[in-house]
Amino acid sequence: IARVLGCKRTVEGGLEGERYVVTWALGHLVELAPPEDYDKAWQKWDMLTLPMLPERMKTVVIPQSGRQFRAVQAQLRRGDVGELVIATDAGREGELVARWILEKAGWKGPARRLWISSQTDKAIREGFTHLRPAAEYDNLFRSARARSEADWLVGLNVTRALTCRHNAQLSAGRVQTPTLALIVEREEAI
């Protein structure tokens, strides 16, 4: 994208051209806060602390991603940046990656969305001629956030309950639990 947009000058955490500054996320830079960020009692794995039901879910910068988050945030805070183009993967997770970064970085300016399924020069150029208001993707972001919050609530609560109840390191999750059930079912059939 940076090459197609003519961004060649290196800046902190990005590349700059005459019209655009391109930066990147390298996957998730922000995630839902761990249990102990809501309540210190939730740091201990104990049946008495379950269920863990935060009144409002919070996000935190992933510690290993802090440097890149700060680089993105620095680009967003530049005085010459008046609009943002979200160019993460076209899909639910890509929307979540971008929106959580923007929320955590405090971006309040206008935003548009690049929605492309190919990284060819032609696709990128065409995509930039058809940018849509980011608000048109709000429901996609909401669905991604709901999925992430549900995974946190079910995964952490059920994992802790199983581990505490059976005194063994066990885990449960939205995808892994039914997948394991299918494997067990298949194994029993053999």
Where are these regions (language model features)?
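Intrinsically disordered, low-complexity regulatory segments
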Residues: I1-R145
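Prokaryote-biased recognition of long, low-complexity C-terminal linker/tail segments
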Residues: R147, D151-I190
